[in-house]
Amino acid sequence: MSLTPRQLGEQLRQRKQRRQPIAVLTAWDALSASWAEAAGVDLVLVGDSLAMVALGHATTLPVTLEAMVQHTAAVERGLRHTPIVSDLPFLSYQCGPDQAVAAAGRFLKETGCAGVKLEGGEPETIAVIDRLVRSGIPVMGHLGLTPQSVHQLGYRRQATDPVAQERLWQRALELQQTGCFALVLEHVPAELATRLSAELSVPVIGIGAGEGCDGQVRVSADLLGLTPQQPPFSPALLDGRELFSQALRQWVQGVQSAPVPPANHSAPHC
């Protein structure tokens, strides 16, 4: 990558200061990475959503650290200059700072990514982020709807009452103070996200959090209409499933309807 981890954080902060919206797309392999870069994104996120998009799981929970490292390396090979941030998957950092440093270190050493993303803002997570940052590993935070907590919180909208909003606000401030270079806010009220974006000095990247954030992130497969179920806050821009299926169906039907060539037209045996 052309940007070092430190340069990535500085570049994103400069875009925030200049009020230049930040565009982030996910990728899960070299091909999807090349699509994102051709579109001109500022940052590629290798999200643990690849568990659902590429590996067929119902949630993000089953994806392993090994799989995330492998897919992140593939994404890196599909890019020329766009920086990468990768998700630390479920149970790769929840056991404590030592585990988190070992896991995050693999991404920086083996994949060329510029940082990692962690979900949550509980005291235990803050301690993990503090250790990562002090170890020289850039961290992007993630609050609101956190898919790794699906069994506790579900996929419903988060921070919808004053108590929950105050808790999210304080956690966002803690993440910034601990050293996160950016923050993802997912599926929270737009007014709250707008106020937080104005309050924080680090960029706030929204998904389902309104248009008042410093940038937006989307799962590429959702935008392309490739996933069977669309999140309500991430509508598709085209019906990719139907377009791809139609093209493949046309080829299959052409093969199946073609006349079988006579035996003497087959290639000679060597």
UniProtKB/Swiss-Prot annotation:
**Annotated Mg(2+) binding sites:** 48, 87, 119
Family according to the record:
Belongs to the PanB family.
Name this polypeptide is given: 3-methyl-2-oxobutanoate hydroxymethyltransferase
Q: What does this protein do?
A: Catalyzes the reversible reaction in which hydroxymethyl group from 5,10-methylenetetrahydrofolate is transferred onto alpha-ketoisovalerate to form ketopantoate.
Q: Which domain of life is it from?
A: Bacteria
A Pfam short name: Pantoate_transf
Going by the UniProt record, its keywords in alphabetical order are:
Cytoplasm, Magnesium, Metal-binding, Pantothenate biosynthesis, Transferase
Instruction: Give the cofactor binding note.
Output: Binds 1 Mg(2+) ion per subunit.
One GO MF term on file is: magnesium ion binding
Q: Does the keyword Phosphoprotein apply?
A: no
Q: Which organism is it from?
A: Synechococcus sp. (strain RCC307)
Q: What broad class of enzyme is this?
A: transferase
